[in-house]
Amino acid sequence: MSSEAETQQPPQPAADAESPSSPAAAATAGDKKVIATKVLGTVKWFNVRNGYGFINRNDTKEDVFVHQTAIKKNNPRKYLRSVGDGETVEFDVVEGEKGAEAANVTGPGGVPVQGSKYAADRNRYRRYPRRRAPPRDYQENYQSDPEAEPREKREGAESAPEGEMQQQQRRPTYPGRRRYPPYFVRRRYGRRPPYTNSQRGEMTEGGEGEENQGGPDQGNKPMRQNYYRGFRPSRGPSRPRPVRDGEEDKENQSESGQNQEPRQRRYRRNFNYRRRRPQTTKPQDGKDSKAADASADKSAAPEAEQGGAD
C-alpha cells in the first residue's frame, strides 16, 4: 500500500492554466481572466464625456467594451484619455462582469493612441515652467517728466554700489511692450484725467477754470473727481440774483472794489445761501406800509373836501 501511494504522482496542472509569472496573468486587471492578448480592433464609438465606448475585434467581429481607464498610452497632447471613432487600436481582451472588456489599449505596435477629436487639448505653452517676469517698475517704463522723479529714488541710486547698478542694467527689456501704471489702466475707457492747475488757469470766464479758482489754499488742492459711472458734475454759470433798490449802491461799490483786486481771489458762491430768506425785507415792508398809509390819507382828504362842497 505504501509503495503504491509513493508511486502515485499528483495530477499535473492544466496546460492552459496561467502561472503567476506569465505575461497573461500580469495583464489581468483586478483578477480578471485574460481571454486574448495583442488583438487588433476598430473603435466603433467612444463617448468622451461619459468615458466609455466599444471596439469591434477584427478577428471575431465581436464588440468589446472599453473604458477610459483601460487606455494605457494616451495621446500626450490630449487632456483626457480617449480613442477616436474608426481608429485602429491594439488591446487585450479580459472577462468582465457583463462580458468581454478591453485592457491595455494602445495604438498598433504599442504606440500612443490618437484620441478623439472631441477631447480637449492641453495648453500648448504650459509644458515647461514659466519664467518669472522681472518686477514692474512704473517709474522707469512710464515717466513723462524726468524732473518728477522722486528724490528718494535718486538718492538711493546714487548711494547704491556699482555691482547693483550693473545688475539693474542687465534686466531684460521687452520691446514693443509698454507698461502703464495701475491708476491709468483703471481710467482707460470713457474717463479723462483731472485738469491740472495750469489748464484751469488758462480757461475763460464762466467756465470751470474761474469757478475752481478759489482762495489761495484752493488753488494748490488737487481736483477731486467722482469715479462712479454715470456721474456728471453740474457746473454752470451762476444765475444772477434779483437786485433790490437798497442793494444797487452796495453792488456798485463791491464791483469797483473787485476790479481793483486780482481775479484769483474770487470764489464760488455757496448755493445754500439762496434758500435762506433775506433779512432786509422787514424794514422795507415797514416803509411800504407807511407809504401806503400816506397815500390812503391823501386820497381820503380830497374826497372829504368834495363832500363838504356838495
UniProtKB/Swiss-Prot annotation:
Give the Basic and acidic residues compositional bias ranges.
148-157, 242-253
Question: Which InterPro entries does its entry note?
Answer: Cold_shock_domain, CSD, CSD_CS, CSP_DNA-bd, NA-bd_OB-fold
MF (Gene Ontology): C5-methylcytidine-containing RNA reader activity; eukaryotic initiation factor 4E binding; methyl-CpG binding; miRNA binding; nucleic acid binding; RNA binding
Q: What is its main location?
A: cytoplasm
Q: Report residue spans for region: Disordered.
A: 1-31, 102-310
Low complexity bias spans: 1-29, 292-301
UniProt-recorded name of the protein: Y-box-binding protein 1
Organism placement in taxonomy: Eukaryota, Metazoa, Chordata, Craniata, Vertebrata
State the encoding gene: ybx1
